[in-house]
Curated annotation (Swiss-Prot):
Catalytic activity: L-homoserine + ATP = O-phospho-L-homoserine + ADP + H(+)
Protein family membership: Belongs to the GHMP kinase family. Homoserine kinase subfamily.
Organism: Petrotoga mobilis (strain DSM 10674 / SJ95)
Annotated GO MF terms: ATP binding; homoserine kinase activity
Main location: cytoplasm
Entry GO CC: cytoplasm
Pathway the protein acts in: Amino-acid biosynthesis; L-threonine biosynthesis; L-threonine from L-aspartate: step 4/5
Protein name: Homoserine kinase
Length: 307
């Protein structure tokens, strides 16, 4: 049996629309083995309303993409999915399925494709690199999907940096979130974001966290999506008052992320108490950065072959 462990991801990080992403220490596990015939997909009972267990399953679709690419098809498959990444919450659940499915398929066939080839397949399936890249390689990534390849850079983040995830109890699809965006943006808004992307990346990598309250600002996507996030203004205002260094909408939402530097317990507890007074359910959790990305797990533990 082949096992892969795929991290959650948070994308955009404010101004880095469709290009920046960070891997998080929250994981899905995918287990696959070849069987004599058919397709068997096993998922937890609580996920059965949201995840298909037939050929439309996204993990299987990713596996099939690789099988078709190399023209090798197993007789049958048993796929076990252990899902810890919340679905449709802006934490890269779809990217985890795509990345994990491609890698587990590659492993099943004794690795006919190189990592860069798999990354390209994943990015073409997802349409963007912002969640795909950190799921593969960990850390902070910036990338571009070109006609025949993906260009990217991975950067290590300071170990004291953590993310405070405020996860609503409702789904918000990427398709719906994209439908809220304008077809065109004013040049001054584009310049606003471009200037802050550079400041954001440099500040994160060099621990200049004092810049993050400004560097995470955005005029391209968050202004159009925030009205669909209950209590956005109240939550983000509270985040800054209690000591987070900056905040942003995670991916297309609805999760809101606060950036933490070091000690966080009082901030986490205060946020839980604050949110308990609203009529919208939220889960608050502190997540460490996943520095290594996806891992293939064998009987002796991780072999780390995709780092």
């Amino acid at each position: 049996m082949i096992r892969v462990k795929v991290p959650a991801t948070t994308a955009n990080i404010g101004p880095g629309f469709d290009s920046l992403g960070i891997a998080l220490q929250l994981y899905n596990i995918i287990e696959v083995e070849e069987i004599n015939f058919g397709l068997e997909i096993n998922i937890p009972v609580e996920d059965q309303a949201y995840i298909e267990t037939n050929e439309h399953n996204l993990v299987y679709q990713a596996m099939k993409r690789l099988f078709d690419a190399v023209n090798i098809h197993p007789k049958g498959l048993r796929i076990n999915l252990i899902n810890n990444i919340p679905i449709a919450r802006g934490l890269g659940s779809s990217a985890a399925c795509i990345v994990g499915g491609l890698v587990v398929a590659n492993e099943l066939l004794n690795n006919p494709l190189k990592k860069e080839e798999i990354i390209y397949l994943a990015a073409t399936m997802d349409g963007h690199t912002d969640n795909i890249l950190p799921a593969f390689v960990g850390g902070l990534t910036v990338g571009s999907l070109l006609e025949k390849e993906v260009k990217y850079v991975k950067m290590d983040l300071p170990t004291q940096l953590k993310l405070l995830a405020i996860i609503p109890d409702f789904h918000f699809s990427t398709k719906k979130a994209r439908s809220l965006l304008p077809k065109n943006v004013p040049i001054e808004d584009a310049v606003f974001n471009i200037s802050r992307v550079g400041l954001l990346v440099a500040s994160l990598v060099t621990s200049h966290f004092e810049n993050l309250s400004e560097a995470t600002k955005d005029k391209i996507h968050q202004p159009y999506r925030k009205d669909f996030i209950p209590y956005w203004e109240e939550i983000t205002s509270k985040l800054m008052k209690i000591g987070t260094k900056g905040y942003f909408l995670s991916g297309s939402g609805p999760t809101i992320m606060g950036i933490l530097d070091g000690d966080y317990k009082n901030i986490e507890d205060e946020m839980v108490n604050f949110l308990s007074h609203f009529d919208q359910g939220y889960k608050v959790t502190v997540l460490d950065v996943c520095h290594n990305g996806l891992e293939v797990i064998n009987d002796e533990g991780s072999n780390g072959c995709y780092r």
